[in-house]
Every structure is written in structure tokens, then in C-alpha cells.
Amino acid sequence: CENIEGLQLRIGIHLGDVIFENNDVFGDSVNIAARLQALAPISAIWISESVHKNISNKQGIISTFVKEENLKNVKEPVNIYEVDINSFHAETAVPVRTPGSAISPSALDKQKKSFPARKVLSIGLPILAIAMAASFFIPSTLKKQHARNDLLPAIDKLVLENFRVPTKAFDMGVEAEKYIAEDSVLIKLWPIISATPKLRTEPEGAEVFWKDYHTPEAEWRSAGTTPLTDVRFPRGYLRLEFRKKGFQTIEYAGSLAAEPMRLDTALIQLDSTSTLPDDMVRMPKSSTHMYLVGLEQHGPKDVDGFLIDRHEVTNEAFGKFIEAGGYTDRSYWKHPFIQNGKEISFEQAVTLFLDKTGRPGPATWEAGTYPDGHTLHPVTGVSWYEADAYATYAGKQLPTVFHWGAVAATWRTEFIVPFSNFSGKGTIPVGSLPGISTFGLYDLAGNAREWCSNESTNAAHRYILGGGWNDPSYAYNDAYFQPAIDRSLTNGFRCIKVLPGDTTIATLLKPVALAFRNYLIEKPVDDKTFDFFLTQFSYDKTPLNEKTDATLDRENWTIEKISFDAGYNNERIELYLYLPKNKKPPYQPVLFFPGSGDLYSKIYNPDGIEGRIDFLLKSGRAIVRPIYKGTHERHDNIKSDLPEATVFYKDHVIMWRKDIGRTLDYLETRTDMQNDKVGYVGWSWGGFMGGIMPAIEKRIKAIVLNVGGMCMTPALPEVDQINFLPRVTQPVLMLNGKHDMYFPVETSQKPMFNLLGTKKPQKKLIIYESGHLVPRTDFAGETLAWFDKYLGPVK
């Protein structure tokens, strides 16, 4: 028992209470023991002061003070002692070493020599048993403590810091589940960091693989074979593949917590490898919203299922069209040619479709062929007429803007664009960058612009979408048309194939009007006209007849549900007033104007602020959340936040103003509000309305607009945002994304900022490398700093 070679242990011991639950043991005592074990040298036994005191009068055990240590997740410092294993050889009790004391070496040597064998067995064997048990118990305990004390807080931090929870949080959850699967905190986190979609394929039996979209070089992870009903996936943006022997592999990009994959009815059709034309992908039937600036007002549109080219048409493929008589066979050319507003003949047109040396072919070619090494580059330098002729030759057609919109996933531009070709240097081989869109289509963003079949309101102009290698990256979000005869060096295309029985194509092929306003040219109305407009927003200060309908208690704040007369249509306004518990009144009230999602909801969720704007409460401010006309329980026939040149829309703007006015009137009846320090936070739609409401309501003293901007659809002049922006004079902070698909930087964000009437030192625009959402920590930090500066710090 005195010499056991090869046994290397280190032991940490603490005396205290522990909790046993579901065959698991945990608590502060376990944590302290585990931390001591981790700190101890090999072959050492480190104990806490509670153990030291317990053994201080025990015969034959000496413990020596080592140091005071701050252990992780332990509130108070811990005094650490080391057990002197040699002391087990002492015959009688010896003084215990304490900080500042010492033992005579001669006395210790004497006691070692006189220690009987039975004492070795009676003390050494129990210690050895403890040590051997610890060698198995402590690693498991450490991992459980690591899961509880390190992984769970790290997951929670990622959740709090990100509007979209990153895959890293999911991976931490998977690791934690190995050791604390039944932990209540982890169980509550799973719905936040993961999704469990019902994935079905026809036929069944496809193996599903996934990886994070942002790490295309990572190894694929298998989730099992379809149907999948209870398998967790990260909630973030993913790359997926559905693989089944004998069938075409389906690539997919998107979040499995969002449509279409989150729908229980989602069914993925697999096609045998010989069924589909080469390099084409099946797209399912969809109701397509148009997330393209200037075309939003045309959605949603029903689009029947169709096939689409996985890649842009290449130089090699276009060369075969030329070899087949593409520029001489008139059967491929179905549409009248228009140049400078006049129709020209086929013979005249083909004289325009020449390469650099005067031979038939794209404008980028030379001597009848494409540049060396560009075989698999997208064909570019072609007119719409040439693209359409090729599609006819191939037995296909150009996509409509609605087909293109159904596959582009422009609402995730900030993910796709970094993996796409907007290099400014030239085209690259198709599919060589991993910036895929929804169903595994490559290069929809950048490389070549892509002609679409629709004409604008002018038959001579056709849409061309996605942007090209020499365009700014935000061109991916913009709807754009140009003369069909244009042969710019970036013009390319891909094709679709309409399936038998399609009932939507006739509607989708119709001309599409583009909404666009050039705010660099448009001018606001003069002051006299604007003063006349203001009169429509006046209202009588009739009694509020306020009533507190409910009080909801939360851990860190209280929610008061209040109602009062709206002052129009005999309606009542519901107000949710959030009051922080960490500060005493009076509070700085922050008025919140939400995004357009509230127009599609019929029930307000009082806890919906968590993870979005609850940082305002944590800062000690109150959140003022009226239910605006047309939203939630006050739902009506307004269907969109887009401005319209209608009396119906104008009436709603007036009602929204009155909702704000009456809300601020109510706040003035309370003594717990600092009504001279009212802030405004507008989110998306609320960011747009932040360019109108503060011009009318001067009780608002400081403004933060989160992803706001100017719209391309006009309203009647008396409620048109452009006429209000110069009259917004309060301090304004604008937080925007470079890849915003609603409010583009150059045509929407910057014009709004420049038109604001606020003095230059008091307005600020920050543009992030993001889409229609800015990083949460930046949103919170910049907002609080802005309010601290212009409303004053919370006291």
C-alpha cells in the first residue's frame, strides 16, 4: 500500500451539501471539489477549509495551507490545503499546519519511522479507495460542471447577443446534452437554438446532410434519412443536401425554422438521375413575395412548380447555339426587335449582334469564339433578344421576375453576397463560388446579370436581375430593367422550363411596372403647404377615460395593460407599458413603433420584446407599446406597410399619428414618467414612420431608426414621407444594413438621412455589413448611447 507504481492521481475534496437528481449529483460543493481537483498537481490531494477543519484533530493526517484562490462560479475565495500523504506514517497526532505555522522535520521523521503497518492499512486503503473512485467520478463531474457552468452561460450569451442564433450555440447545446440532458435550463434553450422540422421526401429514404452556410468547407453532418420528424437542426442559415442513390442530389440553403421547410406540408420531390434535363433543378409550387426593391407591391404571386438551370448559361453552351445556326434560323427569334423606340427587321437586328471582330456572337467574344480559358464562364455581352433565342433553341424560356424572385432568396443577401462574384475583375467559371440560393442555384448574385422575360411598361425594356461582376453587391436586391437591345459586358442569363399543366405562367408573363422614385431629384413641399398638411393631424383633447385592464409581473419588469379612448371612430387604444424593476421612477419613456409583421398578426404577445428591445428596460427606461390601428387586436383591411396613393392609406397615417398623440397624452397623466425625455425607436416599418411622426409630434425628443429608409411607392402628398423629413429636427440615429432588400443604401437610406431637418452634428448614419437587420449588440449599444446623450443618463 505504500508503493503503487504507475498510479497517478490528483484529488480534490470539499465537505458540503450536494443535490442528487435523476442519477446525477451537482451543486456548489461538487463544483468546488472539481475545481480543486483540476488545480492540484499530479499525486496530490487538495482540500478545502471545511475538510481541513474536519480532520484537524484526526490522528495521523497533516494538511498544509497552500493558497487562497478565487474559483470559477464560486462567490467567495476558497482557502486551499494540501494533505501530506507522508503524514499517514505518523503514530500519533501532530499539530496541523495552518497559514504561518511549520512543523519540525526531525519530529516528522521520527513519527514516520514509528508508524505501524495496521495504521497504513486503516488509513491508506480508504484514501486509495477514494482516489480510485475519484479517478472515475471526477472527470464525469467536471464535464457536467463544465456543461452547466460554462456551456449553458455561453449559449445564453450567444442568444442574447444575436437576433439570429449562430450554429455555435447549437453545437454547444449538443455537447452539453451528453452530460446534462435533463437540465431544465438546457431544455428551455433547445427551442431557441434549434428547430425540428418535418422533412419528407418523395420517395422516402433520402439521407439528409447539413453544415453551417458560413462554413462551406466544413464536413457534412448526417441528420438521418427521411422522413425526419424529431431531429434537431440549428436555427441559423444552413446548407443541406438530400442524397439517395439513383436520384439527383438536392442542394438547399435556408433556415429550417423558416418557410418553406418549417411547414408540416413541406415535401421534397426527388427526381431520378435520368428524369431531369442536364443541370436543371426542380422548384416546388410557391406563393412568391417579391423582395426586390421596386417590385414589392406585386407580391405575393402564385408560381407553379418549374425547372430552372442550376448555373448561368456558359460560353460553351452558347457556342453550340451558334453552331446550330442560332443567328440565321429565324424560328428561334419570336419577338419584334425595337431599337431607339422603332421596330427593326430581323436582318437589321442580326447586324447588331456581332462580336469584337464583326462575326455573329456575343459582344465579349472575338473571331467567332469566346476568350481562351473561358469555356465554363457565363456567356455575357448578349441582348435580351439573343438570350430569348437561345432559350427557344434549348426548348426552354427565360424566367419571369416572379420565377427569379422565387429562387433568389434576396432576404438573405448578407449571407449569399460574400460568397458571390462582385469582384469588379471579370466573370469566373459558373458554380466556382459557394454562394448558393434556396434550392442550390449558383451565381444568382453577381457574376453575370440575368435577363428575365417580362417587359416593363415599355415593350422595348426588359428586366435584368441579380447584378453582375462589375456591379455593387447591393444590386442583388434591386429590380432593374434596360433596353432589350442592350449588349453590356455583364449581360447574361439562365433558363427555366415550364411544366405541363402550369396555370400561372400566362399571368406571370404580363408587363410589370417598376416603382422607383429618384429622391435626388424630388423635392419636398414648401413650408406653407406643409403647415396646411399639418392641420389634418389635429385632434380634440377629449377625456381619455383610461383604464388599467391588467398587470403582468415578469422577473425584471412589470407590464401594465391600459386602454383609453382613441379619439376617433369610437375606438379604444390598448397600450402595453413596460416598467423596469431595477430603477425607481420617474422613467424615461421610449415609444416603440414596430415592423410590418404586426399588420399580419391578430394577437399581441407581451413577451415579444425579449431579445429585441428589452435592453431598454435593462437600462432603466420604460417601453411604451401602443397597439396601432391595423395591428394585432386592432386588425383591419390594411394589408401592407407600403405607401399607397389612396385615401385609405392616408386615413391610416392620420390614425397612427393620433394613436401616438393620445398615448403621449396618457403618459402626461402619470407622475412616474419623465415626459420631457420621450424617446422613439422605430423598427423597419417603424423606421420609415420615424421619418413622419416626429415631424408632427414634437414631444418626441430623441430618435433611433433601426433599418429604416424611404419607399419607392408614392403616397398622397399630404402623407408622403419626403414632405415630412425636413421637418424632423430632433436628434436622429439611423442604423442600417448594406444589403437591405427593402431600403437600399444609395436610393433609400442615404436620401432619407440627407433630407432629415436635424442639424448635422445631431444626426448619424451607421451602415453595417448586414441585411434588413443590424447586429443586436450594436443596436443595443448605439441606441443606449444615443439616448444617454440626448435624453440624459438614467439616474
Could you tell me what each predicted segment is?
Residues P543-K583:
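N-terminal cap/lid segment of alpha/beta-hydrolase-fold proteins
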Residues C711-G757:
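The feature captures the conserved acid-bearing segment of alpha/beta-hydrolase catalytic domains
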Residues M283, T328, H335-I338, I344-D355, ...:
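Functional-site microenvironments in short loops/helix caps that host divalent-cation chemistry
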Residues S596-K658:
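Cap/lid segment of the alpha/beta-hydrolase catalytic domain
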Residues P586-G595:
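Short beta-strand element of the alpha/beta-hydrolase
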Residues I138-Q145, N149-D304:
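Short loop/turn and low-complexity linker motifs enriched in small/turn-promoting residues
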Residues L642-W683:
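Gly/Ser-rich "nucleophile elbow"/oxyanion-hole loop immediately N-terminal to the catalytic nucleophile
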Residues C1-D84:
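Catalytic beta-strand-to-alpha-helix segment of the class III nucleotidyl cyclase homology domain
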